[in-house]
């Protein structure tokens, strides 16, 4: 789930050329069908310049391999997609293929109303389950109101990890070593503050940096061996958000906000603008996701790592998963249209598409082909290694807002109150849990 919206990610020209060149080379065998004089309406959320360049080239390649087919592309921000997708499909004038946010509020609601078609047939036909693990595909499964089981309604092209961005030059200038444990991170923040350096870049006016910070800190304190409780929450099996760990995470973030650990004026800065400030050299750390790799690579001093875990946590979890899923809507009325949509999605999650994304500096969910030799940025190299480790350790965590249709709004409404000290950490977590318990009650 890509949580970023408005800003444009400007890639260096040579990276855009590399991405386009690799995408152009991707005209290989990907199940070509007979030519069909047809249009395919597609909505995606790749609004960043670097992302959009890759999608545009991939679309051109698909059209070239399918004479007569025209991709009618509409790019929408994450927030716009949430507002308009379900209504557009319901009204009959939306996309045939779309990106859709996983979780109860979007994919779950659309499945419930019959607005999305299962893609299990295409998983089997194209072998998508060989490209991505079952635990990743489970994030696109719904059976009635049950999340994580049943039929599969989508598949994603990009992987996502929420982690710790750091500016190595700022740390070196302040005499601060890269933290290896959570206690070392806390000590580093104190030292940076003493030196007059903003420890964290933050922007809370728009987007969801604070949400990711709270979730990432909490899940870094969970060992993968003990992940069942979190899984149950996200997949609607029950439990409570009102835990000591969630309260402590909210308390720590509130203390940072109140204690001068965030960039001055963060309350009036959007998340995307905060990222641009960080790229320009403001702030030592920033907690967010790999979807900013395309922007972050413009500053060679910026690195990326997992949130340092406390002692005793051997396989810490990281918030993350995959970006919005490619899905087929109910507007694919006949089998020919459905099969064309399935072919399109197959190409978007193919090894060649993964190679194009990697060349542009983004983290693909599908493994790169064995003979691929893209020039990987240091950030992407770090991201790929983290992705491998998290999957090997079964330590890929969850976005908290996936747990109910209204959880994102509940968190967004209460986060400014938490950061400003107008509500306690206990009240913040209680609001999340009340939302969740109401959802569980409505499901019955």
List each language-model region with its residue ranges.
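Conserved N-terminal structural module of periplasmic/extracytoplasmic solute-binding proteins
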Residues: 23-24, 35-115, 124-131, 178, ...
């Amino acid at each position: 789930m890509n949580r970023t919206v408005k800003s444009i990610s400007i890639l260096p020209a040579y990276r855009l050329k590399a991405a386009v060149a690799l995408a152009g080379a991707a005209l290989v065998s990907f199940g070509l069908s007979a030519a069909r004089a047809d249009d395919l309406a597609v909505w995606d959320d790749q609004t960043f310049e670097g992302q959009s360049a890759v999608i545009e080239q991939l679309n051109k390649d698909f059209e070239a391999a399918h004479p007569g087919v025209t991709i009618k592309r509409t790019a929408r921000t994450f927030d716009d997609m949430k507002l308009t997708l379900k209504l557009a499909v319901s009204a009959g004038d939306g996309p045939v293929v779309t990106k859709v946010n996983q979780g109860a509020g979007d994919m779950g609601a659309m499945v419930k109303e019959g607005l999305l078609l299962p893609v299990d047939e295409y998983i089997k036909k194209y072998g998508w389950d060989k490209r991505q693990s079952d635990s990743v595909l489970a994030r696109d499964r719904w059976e009635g109101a049950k999340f994580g089981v049943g039929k599969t309604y989508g598949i994603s092209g990009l992987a996502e990890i929420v982690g710790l961005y750091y500016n190595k030059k700022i740390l070196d200038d302040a005499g601060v070593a890269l933290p290896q444990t959570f206690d070392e991170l806390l000590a580093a923040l104190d030292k940076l503050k003493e030196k007059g350096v903003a420890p964290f870049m933050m922007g809370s006016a728009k987007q969801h940096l604070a949400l990711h910070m709270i979730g990432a800190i909490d899940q870094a304190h969970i060992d993968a061996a003990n992940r069942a409780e979190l899984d149950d929450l996200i997949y609607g099996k029950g439990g409570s958000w009102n835990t000591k760990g969630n309260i402590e995470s909210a308390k720590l973030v509130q203390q940072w906000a109140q204690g001068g650990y965030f960039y001055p004026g963060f309350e009036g800065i959007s998340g995307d603008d905060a990222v641009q400030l960080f790229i320009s050299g403001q702030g030592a750390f920033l907690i967010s996701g790999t979807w900013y790799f395309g922007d972050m690579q413009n500053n060679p001093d910026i690195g990326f790592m997992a949130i340092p875990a406390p002692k005793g946590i051997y396989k810490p979890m990281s918030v993350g998963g995959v970006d919005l899923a490619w899905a087929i809507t109910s507007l694919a009325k006949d089998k020919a249209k459905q099969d064309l949509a399935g072919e399109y999605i197959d190409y978007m999650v193919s090894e060649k598409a993964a190679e194009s994304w990697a060349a542009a500096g983004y983290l693909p969910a599908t493994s790169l082909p064995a003979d691929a030799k893209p020039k990987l940025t240091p950030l992407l190299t770090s991201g790929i290694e983290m992705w491998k480790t998290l999957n090997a350790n079964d330590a890929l965590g969850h976005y908290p807002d996936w747990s109910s249709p209204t959880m994102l709004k509940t968190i967004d409404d209460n986060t400014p109150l938490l950061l400003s000290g107008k509500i306690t950490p206990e009240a913040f977590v209680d609001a999340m849990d009340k939302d969740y318990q109401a959802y569980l009650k409505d499901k019955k």
